[in-house]
């Protein structure tokens, strides 16, 4: 079965169309003010009106106030929530939507414990640990740190590009891959050719 691909950090309608036309399975929209890919509610709602059928929409949050998450959900019809901070399982589950939990992986991260702690998650998104930055860094972690029989679905992220995603898929065999900076021309601005090549390389592996 072909790996699924999420293009994260969508800020422009042209980038949304480029991702969907290239075969993206999911699109990520960032609701974190410190990110250069952050969206207002109005901007996000306008973008989601352009999403075609059968493409999943994912909202990314970092230690957000629950009331803020609820306000986003009232304005923006997201399919899946992605929590990228220090949220506890109860924080993630309280909104009544499917969710995934990002884990910033370093050498001493116990991923089996993370999988047990977040057993109710639809999957674990594994990203590189960079001090003070919750994600979107373009940094890669050592894939050998991923246990071979992790009970959760693995969404591999962190430092993926069109040049290394095929190798990543062959070595890790993740449920999905997630990319943001690896397909950008500048922060928040995607490169349509990079998107197309990334998806082609990921799904051919």
UniProtKB/Swiss-Prot annotation:
Gene3D superfamilies, per database record: Aldolase class I
Biological pathway: Amino-acid biosynthesis; L-tryptophan biosynthesis; L-tryptophan from chorismate: step 3/5
EC number: 5.3.1.24
GO MF, one example: phosphoribosylanthranilate isomerase activity
UniProt keyword terms in alphabetical order: Amino-acid biosynthesis, Aromatic amino acid biosynthesis, Isomerase, Tryptophan biosynthesis
InterPro entries tied to this protein: Aldolase_TIM, PRAI_dom, RibuloseP-bd_barrel, TrpF_fam
GO biological process: L-tryptophan biosynthetic process
Catalytic function, reaction form: N-(5-phospho-beta-D-ribosyl)anthranilate = 1-(2-carboxyphenylamino)-1-deoxy-D-ribulose 5-phosphate
Record keyword Signal present: no
HAMAP family: PRAI
Record-stated family: Belongs to the TrpF family.
Protein name: N-(5'-phosphoribosyl)anthranilate isomerase
Organism of derivation: Thiobacillus denitrificans (strain ATCC 25259 / T1)
Gene name of the record: trpF
């Amino acid at each position: 079965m072909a790996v699924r691909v999420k293009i994260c950090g969508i800020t422009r309608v042209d980038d949304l169309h480029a991702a969907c036309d290239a075969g993206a399975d999911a699109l990520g929209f960032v609701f974190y003010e410190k990110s250069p890919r952050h969206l207002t509610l109005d901007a996000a709602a306008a973008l989601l009106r352009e999403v075609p059928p059968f493409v999943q929409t994912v909202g990314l949050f970092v230690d957000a106030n629950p009331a803020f998450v609820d306000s986003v959900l009232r304005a923006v019809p997201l399919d899946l929530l992605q929590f990228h901070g220090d949220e506890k399982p109860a924080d993630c589950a309280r909104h009544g939507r499917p969710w995934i939990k990002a884990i910033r992986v370093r050498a001493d991260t116990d991923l089996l414990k993370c999988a047990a702690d977040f057993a109710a998650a639809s999957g674990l998104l594994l990203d590189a640990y960079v001090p003070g930055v919750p994600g979107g860094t373009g940094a890669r972690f050592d894939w050998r740190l991923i246990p071979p029989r992790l009970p959760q679905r693995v969404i591999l992220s962190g430092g993926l590009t069109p040049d290394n995603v095929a190798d990543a898929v062959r070595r890790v065999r993740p449920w999905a891959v997630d990319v943001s900076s690896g397909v950008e021309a500048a922060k928040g601005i995607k490169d349509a050719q990079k998107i197309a090549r990334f998806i082609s390389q990921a799904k051919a592996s």
